Curated annotation (Swiss-Prot):
<keyword id="KW-0963">Cytoplasm</keyword>
<dbReference type="GO" id="GO:0016743">
    <property type="term" value="F:carboxyl- or carbamoyltransferase activity"/>
</dbReference>
<comment type="similarity">
    <text>Belongs to the AccA family.</text>
</comment>
<keyword id="KW-0067">ATP-binding</keyword>
<dbReference type="InterPro" id="IPR029045">
    <property type="entry name" value="ClpP/crotonase-like_dom_sf"/>
</dbReference>
<protein>
    <recommendedName>
        <fullName>Acetyl-coenzyme A carboxylase carboxyl transferase subunit alpha</fullName>
        <ecNumber>2.1.3.15</ecNumber>
    </recommendedName>
</protein>
<comment type="function">
    <text>Component of the acetyl coenzyme A carboxylase (ACC) complex. First, biotin carboxylase catalyzes the carboxylation of biotin on its carrier protein (BCCP) and then the CO(2) group is transferred by the carboxyltransferase to acetyl-CoA to form malonyl-CoA.</text>
</comment>
<keyword id="KW-0547">Nucleotide-binding</keyword>
<dbReference type="GO" id="GO:0006633">
    <property type="term" value="P:fatty acid biosynthetic process"/>
</dbReference>
<dbReference type="Pfam" id="PF03255">
    <property type="entry name" value="ACCA"/>
</dbReference>
<dbReference type="InterPro" id="IPR001095">
    <property type="entry name" value="Acetyl_CoA_COase_a_su"/>
</dbReference>
<dbReference type="InterPro" id="IPR011763">
    <property type="entry name" value="COA_CT_C"/>
</dbReference>
<feature type="domain" description="CoA carboxyltransferase C-terminal">
    <location>
        <begin position="1"/>
        <end position="236"/>
    </location>
</feature>
<keyword id="KW-0443">Lipid metabolism</keyword>
<dbReference type="GO" id="GO:0003989">
    <property type="term" value="F:acetyl-CoA carboxylase activity"/>
</dbReference>
<keyword id="KW-0275">Fatty acid biosynthesis</keyword>
<keyword id="KW-0276">Fatty acid metabolism</keyword>
């Protein structure tokens, strides 16, 4: 098994810590909030308010299940438009009250069903991209498993994007890439080699800003490491003038 194939397998491992795991272990007094106030509450996106040390923050994540029943309730971590609208509602609330936003991303992509398209999946993702680019509070996005397509990017227009060591981030799944390029989804590993989806490759290209080493899926060292980095980075981001913060975020994505 090649290194990329191993990372692809580990990124999708059902045993990985979820967004709610990180929310409960890194933050204090996490309180989940529900609903987009327009249509429904999408279980594949979770979010709420919490404390990071003494700093109030908004935490948002894409939630996969740990078993079949949970995955069905979470739609296998594939958000509907109401999930992205819930995330945006929480981000605008964070902006109103001056809370930094931290997102945890683990999705193969946004749900491509007919109903999701009818309810404006593309619009919901595009609006998140637009609003996050100008959100007037610090944003840090962390890839904790799969970071697939626009479904991941809709929570990743951030001042800093981090990846755990054995995760992936790509414009689409390797299977989708192989199906388009060679009409053969079984060549996913070969596609992954070409796509440069690993944390090391993306860090080298400047797409991400930090790699979090992994020593096991439930390692207390990982949680503590992320917490300390978050405290340090948010302190630095909050010290910047708002105009500088937003300009650097804009330039970060323009360079691609």
């Amino acid at each position: 098994m090649t290194d990329v194939a191993r990372i692809l397998k580990e990124a999708r491992d059902q045993g990985r810590m979820t967004a709610l795991d990180y929310a409960s272990l890194i933050f204090d007094e996490f309180m989940e909030l529900h609903g987009d106030r327009q249509f429904a509450d999408d279980g594949s996106i979770v979010g709420g308010i919490a404390y990071l040390a003494d700093q109030p923050v908004t935490v948002i994540g894409i939630q996969k299940g740990k078993n079949l029943q949970d995955n069905l309730a979470r739609n296998f971590g594939q958000p509907h438009p109401e999930g992205y609208r819930k995330a945006l509602r929480l981000m605008k609330q964070a902006e109103k009250f001056g809370r930094p936003v931290i997102t945890f991303i683990n999705t193969a992509g946004a749900y491509p069903g007919v109903g999701a398209e009818e309810r404006g999946q593309g619009e919901a993702i595009a609006r998140n991209l637009m609003e996050m680019s100008d959100l007037k509070v610090p944003i840090i996005a962390i890839i904790i498993g799969e970071g697939g397509s626009g479904g991941a990017l809709a929570l990743a227009v951030a001042d800093q994007v981090w990846m755990l060591e054995n995760t992936m981030y790509a414009v689409l799944s390797p299977e989708g890439f192989a199906s388009i390029l060679w009409k053969d989804g079984s060549r996913a590993t070969e596609a992954a080699e070409l796509m440069k989806i690993t944390a090391a490759e993306l860090y080298q290209m400047g797409v991400i800003d930090r790699i979090i080493p992994e020593r096991g899926y439930f390692s207390s060292e990982i949680v503590e490491m992320i917490k300390l980095h978050l405290i340090d980075e948010i302190t630095q981001l909050q010290a910047k003038p708002l105009e500088e913060l937003l300009d650097q975020r804009y330039q970060r994505f323009r360079k691609y």
